[in-house]
Design a protein with these regions (language model features):
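Phosphate-binding and adjacent anionic-ligand microenvironments
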Residues: 246, 251-344
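Oxyanion-binding "anion nests"
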Residues: 233-249
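A short, conserved acidic/glycine-rich loop-to-beta-strand motif
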Residues: 124-134
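Histidine-centered beta-alpha loop that forms part of the nucleotide-sugar donor binding/catalytic region
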Residues: 8, 54, 133-134
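Conserved N-terminal catalytic core of the sugar/cofactor nucleotidyltransferase
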Residues: 2-5, 13, 27-105, 109, ...
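Glycine-rich phosphate/pyrophosphate-binding beta-alpha loops
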Residues: 85, 216-224, 307-311
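A structural signal for short hydrophobic beta-strand segments in well-ordered beta-sheet cores
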Residues: 25, 144-146, 197, 209, ...
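Catalytic-core segments of class I nucleotidyltransferases/pyrophosphorylases
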Residues: 100-102, 109, 115-122, 136-138, ...
């Protein structure tokens, strides 16, 4: 089976992390998040891949090239105007041809069992199959309501708690048939969740929802990004970490002062050059904190500075509310603490 990676995202909500790179190139434990997706596809036997690009396409093409170094064959299709998720995939029609194919986001982290998804699709032969994951905070996502046989009857887009009747969310991982793509107009902005899937249901086509075990995270905000990085380092997210080390969840923090508070000290033996992005500073081995740095965003500020006389960092988080400040400080301390154990 072939796969199309949706990799046109700019990542506006993720700024300043995406200040000088497209969202699929945001680093996750030493590799771009899209590289982890390619490795996931390869583990499940998918090596014929096309990336649908729009924002800063040359950055992505220059990094991955033909895909040979990752053991895959990688092609690219570039949108000249915004086409939406389904429209961007339609732009790859010459790639997928007359075969069913898998669609996956290039800027979400996951270790879902794609082989199970493919097997269910082949067994049931729906117009489209959607990977569903349980989400404890489903308000930011589209929910899928399934019948007893697993076929989707309706969707609820970003509901409030009064309308949350399931915690199964649409992961944006699909297996699509060519007959479904016939409903997508060419060179027109068209979305899978908002346009194509409702239209398929209206026409009486079958949409299969497959609940999937494993990890899935939409890296859409700095908070979710930090949480995803921590999950990767702790082993909750099963990915290949750069450098050859394995994640091992600690029983407790190595520094007793490293706890959830607005001001926390956290040990770190990271040494190299000063980075201007929080993603690089925490995730690239050898970042230099000797001068410290400050990250400012909409309603929050994170300051990281060395403590004189010892190999520790002071992490100070300020935000418009205490809860956000706690979350920022906690995530930053967890990442630094995990890095310390691997760099010591």
């Amino acid at each position: 089976m072939k796969a199309i990676i949706m990799a046109g995202g700019e990542g506006r909500r993720l700024k300043p992390i995406t200040g000088d790179m497209p969202k699929p190139l945001v680093p996750l434990c030493g590799r771009p998040v899209m590289e982890h997706i390619i490795l996931l596809l390869r583990r499940h036997g998918i090596t014929d891949i096309c990336a649908a690009l729009k924002y800063r396409p040359d950055d992505i093409k220059n990094y991955f090239g033909s895909g040979e170094k990752l053991g895959v064959r990688l092609e690219y299709r570039i949108e000249q105007t915004a086409l939406g998720t389904a429209g961007g995939v339609k732009n790859c029609a010459d790639f997928y041809g007359s075969e069913d194919f898998l669609v996956i986001s290039g800027d979400a982290a996951c270790d879902i069992d794609l082989s199970k998804l493919i097997a269910e699709h082949k067994r049931r032969s729906p117009a489209a199959t959607i990977a569903l994951c349980p989400e404890p905070e489903p308000l930011r996502y589209g929910l899928a309501l399934c019948d007893r046989e697993g076929f989707i009857r309706s969707f609820i887009e970003k509901p409030d708690w009064r309308h949350v009747v399931t915690n199964l969310v649409n992961t944006g991982i699909y297996i699509i048939s060519p007959r479904a793509m016939e409903l997508v107009p060419k060179n027109t902005e068209f979305d899978f969740a908002k346009d194509l899937f409702p239209r398929l249901l209206d026409k009486g086509e079958k949409l299969l929802g497959v609940p999937c075990d494993g990890y899935w995270c939409d890296i859409g905000t700095p908070k979710s990004y930090y949480e995803c990085c921590a999950d990767a380092l702790s082993g909750k997210l099963n990915i290949e970490l750069a450098g050859g080390f394995e994640a091992d969840a600690p029983d407790e923090c190595s520094d007793p002062e490293c706890e959830c508070m607005e001001h926390a000290d956290c040990g770190c033996t990271d040494r190299a050059r000063l980075m201007d992005r929080i993603s690089s500073a925490f995730l690239e081995l050898g970042a230099d904190y000797s001068d410290g740095f400050r990250l400012k965003g909409d309603g929050y500020e994170l300051r990281i500075s060395p403590l004189s006389g010892c190999k520790k960092l002071r992490i100070a988080a300020n935000a418009k509310d205490t809860e956000t400040a706690h979350e920022l400080a906690e995530a930053a301390c967890l990442l630094a603490g995990e890095l310390e154990k691997r760099l010591d």
